UniProtKB/Swiss-Prot annotation:
Keywords: DNA-binding, Repeat, Transcription, Transcription regulation
Family: Belongs to the TBP family.
CDD domains for the chain: TBP_archaea (cd04518)
Protein name: TATA-box-binding protein
GO molecular function: DNA binding; DNA-binding transcription factor activity
Gene3D superfamilies to which the protein is assigned, alphabetical: TATA-Binding Protein (3.30.310.10)
Amino acid sequence: MSEREKITIENIVASTSLAEHLDLSRIALALDGSEYEPEQFPGLIYRLQEPKTAVLIFRSGKVNCTGAKNIEDVKRTIKIIIDKLKAADIEVYDDPQIIVQNIVAVYDLESELNLTDIAMSLGLENVEYEPEQFPGLVYRVEEPRVVLLLFGSGKVVCTGAKEESEIEQAVIKVKKELQKVGLI
Protein backbone atom coordinates (compact mmCIF):
# COMPACT_ATOMS: atom_id res chain seq x y z
CA MET A 1 0.00 0.00 0.00
CA SER A 2 1.45 3.40 -0.98
CA GLU A 3 1.81 6.29 1.47
CA ARG A 4 -0.98 8.11 -0.33
CA GLU A 5 -3.37 5.19 0.23
CA LYS A 6 -2.65 5.27 3.98
CA ILE A 7 -3.48 8.99 4.26
CA THR A 8 -7.05 9.84 5.29
CA ILE A 9 -8.30 13.31 4.47
CA GLU A 10 -10.53 14.54 7.29
CA ASN A 11 -11.38 18.05 6.09
CA ILE A 12 -10.82 20.38 3.17
CA VAL A 13 -11.45 24.10 3.52
CA ALA A 14 -11.81 25.97 0.24
CA SER A 15 -12.98 29.40 -0.80
CA THR A 16 -14.47 31.03 -3.86
CA SER A 17 -16.33 34.14 -4.88
CA LEU A 18 -19.87 33.87 -6.27
CA ALA A 19 -20.57 37.56 -6.95
CA GLU A 20 -19.46 41.11 -6.19
CA HIS A 21 -22.24 41.44 -3.60
CA LEU A 22 -24.93 39.12 -2.23
CA ASP A 23 -28.20 39.86 -0.43
CA LEU A 24 -27.98 37.38 2.42
CA SER A 25 -31.56 37.99 3.59
CA ARG A 26 -32.78 36.95 0.15
CA ILE A 27 -30.44 33.95 0.09
CA ALA A 28 -31.68 32.88 3.55
CA LEU A 29 -35.17 32.61 2.05
CA ALA A 30 -33.89 30.72 -1.01
CA LEU A 31 -31.77 28.18 0.89
CA ASP A 32 -34.15 26.18 3.04
CA GLY A 33 -32.60 25.37 6.41
CA SER A 34 -29.91 28.03 6.20
CA GLU A 35 -28.91 29.98 9.30
CA TYR A 36 -28.60 33.74 9.07
CA GLU A 37 -28.44 35.89 12.18
CA PRO A 38 -26.45 38.99 11.22
CA GLU A 39 -26.37 40.28 14.80
CA GLN A 40 -24.56 37.05 15.82
CA PHE A 41 -22.37 36.37 12.76
CA PRO A 42 -21.95 38.32 9.49
CA GLY A 43 -22.30 35.27 7.25
CA LEU A 44 -25.02 32.85 6.26
CA ILE A 45 -24.45 29.20 7.18
CA TYR A 46 -25.81 26.45 4.96
CA ARG A 47 -25.26 22.75 5.60
CA LEU A 48 -25.60 20.07 2.96
CA GLN A 49 -26.24 16.41 3.70
CA GLU A 50 -24.79 15.11 0.42
CA PRO A 51 -21.93 15.76 0.24
CA LYS A 52 -21.74 16.35 4.00
CA THR A 53 -20.33 19.86 3.90
CA ALA A 54 -21.11 23.35 5.14
CA VAL A 55 -20.73 26.71 3.45
CA LEU A 56 -20.39 30.18 4.86
CA ILE A 57 -21.70 32.81 2.48
CA PHE A 58 -20.82 36.48 2.99
CA ARG A 59 -22.30 39.73 1.62
CA SER A 60 -19.03 40.36 -0.22
CA GLY A 61 -19.82 37.33 -2.40
CA LYS A 62 -17.10 35.26 -0.76
CA VAL A 63 -17.95 31.67 0.12
CA ASN A 64 -16.04 29.24 2.34
CA CYS A 65 -16.70 25.51 2.07
CA THR A 66 -15.69 23.16 4.87
CA GLY A 67 -16.16 19.51 5.75
CA ALA A 68 -15.32 18.00 2.37
CA LYS A 69 -13.21 14.84 2.31
CA ASN A 70 -12.06 15.34 -1.29
CA ILE A 71 -11.81 18.07 -3.92
CA GLU A 72 -14.72 16.65 -5.92
CA ASP A 73 -17.03 17.17 -2.93
CA VAL A 74 -15.91 20.81 -2.74
CA LYS A 75 -16.74 21.27 -6.43
CA ARG A 76 -20.10 19.50 -6.04
CA THR A 77 -20.98 21.64 -3.02
CA ILE A 78 -20.23 24.91 -4.85
CA LYS A 79 -22.19 23.72 -7.90
CA ILE A 80 -25.21 22.84 -5.72
CA ILE A 81 -25.10 26.31 -4.13
CA ILE A 82 -24.82 28.00 -7.54
CA ASP A 83 -27.73 25.96 -8.94
CA LYS A 84 -29.97 26.71 -5.93
CA LEU A 85 -29.20 30.43 -6.05
CA LYS A 86 -29.79 30.62 -9.80
CA ALA A 87 -33.09 28.75 -9.36
CA ALA A 88 -34.09 31.56 -6.96
CA ASP A 89 -33.12 34.20 -9.58
CA ILE A 90 -30.06 35.28 -7.62
CA GLU A 91 -27.25 36.26 -9.98
CA VAL A 92 -23.99 34.44 -9.34
CA TYR A 93 -20.94 33.50 -11.38
CA ASP A 94 -21.25 30.35 -13.49
CA ASP A 95 -17.85 28.78 -12.87
CA PRO A 96 -15.93 30.55 -10.10
CA GLN A 97 -12.34 29.68 -9.27
CA ILE A 98 -12.10 27.49 -6.17
CA ILE A 99 -9.02 27.88 -3.98
CA VAL A 100 -8.07 25.24 -1.42
CA GLN A 101 -7.06 27.00 1.80
CA ASN A 102 -6.27 24.01 4.01
CA ILE A 103 -6.33 20.23 3.97
CA VAL A 104 -6.31 18.29 7.24
CA ALA A 105 -5.34 14.63 7.04
CA VAL A 106 -4.33 11.79 9.34
CA TYR A 107 -1.72 9.10 8.92
CA ASP A 108 -0.61 6.21 11.12
CA LEU A 109 3.13 5.51 11.36
CA GLU A 110 2.12 2.12 12.84
CA SER A 111 4.74 2.46 15.56
CA GLU A 112 4.67 4.05 19.01
CA LEU A 113 6.76 7.20 19.21
CA ASN A 114 9.04 8.59 21.90
CA LEU A 115 8.16 12.26 21.43
CA THR A 116 10.93 13.51 23.74
CA ASP A 117 13.61 11.79 21.62
CA ILE A 118 11.93 13.00 18.43
CA ALA A 119 11.87 16.60 19.72
CA MET A 120 15.65 16.40 20.25
CA SER A 121 16.40 14.81 16.88
CA LEU A 122 14.21 17.02 14.67
CA GLY A 123 15.80 20.22 15.94
CA LEU A 124 14.30 22.81 18.25
CA GLU A 125 13.82 25.45 15.56
CA ASN A 126 11.03 23.45 13.89
CA VAL A 127 9.56 21.63 16.89
CA GLU A 128 7.30 22.51 19.81
CA TYR A 129 6.80 19.87 22.45
CA GLU A 130 5.26 20.77 25.78
CA PRO A 131 3.49 17.63 27.03
CA GLU A 132 2.01 19.49 30.02
CA GLN A 133 0.12 21.75 27.59
CA PHE A 134 -0.56 19.47 24.61
CA PRO A 135 0.05 15.72 24.24
CA GLY A 136 1.39 15.99 20.70
CA LEU A 137 4.62 17.21 19.20
CA VAL A 138 4.20 20.09 16.74
CA TYR A 139 6.61 19.79 13.81
CA ARG A 140 6.71 22.64 11.30
CA VAL A 141 7.92 21.26 7.99
CA GLU A 142 9.58 23.88 5.79
CA GLU A 143 9.10 22.15 2.44
CA PRO A 144 6.25 21.53 1.83
CA ARG A 145 4.99 24.22 4.25
CA VAL A 146 2.76 22.14 6.51
CA VAL A 147 2.46 21.39 10.20
CA LEU A 148 2.56 17.81 11.47
CA LEU A 149 1.21 16.88 14.88
CA LEU A 150 2.89 13.67 16.05
CA PHE A 151 1.39 11.65 18.89
CA GLY A 152 2.90 8.90 21.03
CA SER A 153 0.49 6.40 19.48
CA GLY A 154 2.16 6.89 16.09
CA LYS A 155 -0.74 8.87 14.69
CA VAL A 156 0.15 11.97 12.68
CA VAL A 157 -2.17 14.85 11.82
CA CYS A 158 -1.14 17.04 8.90
CA THR A 159 -2.56 20.53 8.53
CA GLY A 160 -1.81 23.49 6.30
CA ALA A 161 -1.51 21.60 3.03
CA LYS A 162 -3.01 23.11 -0.11
CA GLU A 163 -2.67 19.94 -2.21
CA GLU A 164 -2.87 16.24 -1.38
CA SER A 165 0.64 15.71 -2.75
CA GLU A 166 2.04 18.01 -0.03
CA ILE A 167 0.68 15.69 2.66
CA GLU A 168 2.34 12.69 1.05
CA GLN A 169 5.66 14.58 0.72
CA ALA A 170 5.56 15.63 4.39
CA VAL A 171 4.75 12.10 5.59
CA ILE A 172 7.57 10.59 3.53
CA LYS A 173 9.95 13.28 4.80
CA VAL A 174 9.18 12.76 8.51
CA LYS A 175 9.32 8.96 8.13
CA LYS A 176 12.78 9.20 6.52
CA GLU A 177 14.01 11.57 9.23
CA LEU A 178 12.75 9.30 12.02
CA GLN A 179 14.12 6.15 10.34
CA LYS A 180 17.50 7.82 9.82
CA VAL A 181 17.90 8.33 13.60
CA GLY A 182 16.33 4.97 14.50
CA LEU A 183 13.16 6.35 16.11
CA ILE A 184 10.76 4.24 14.04
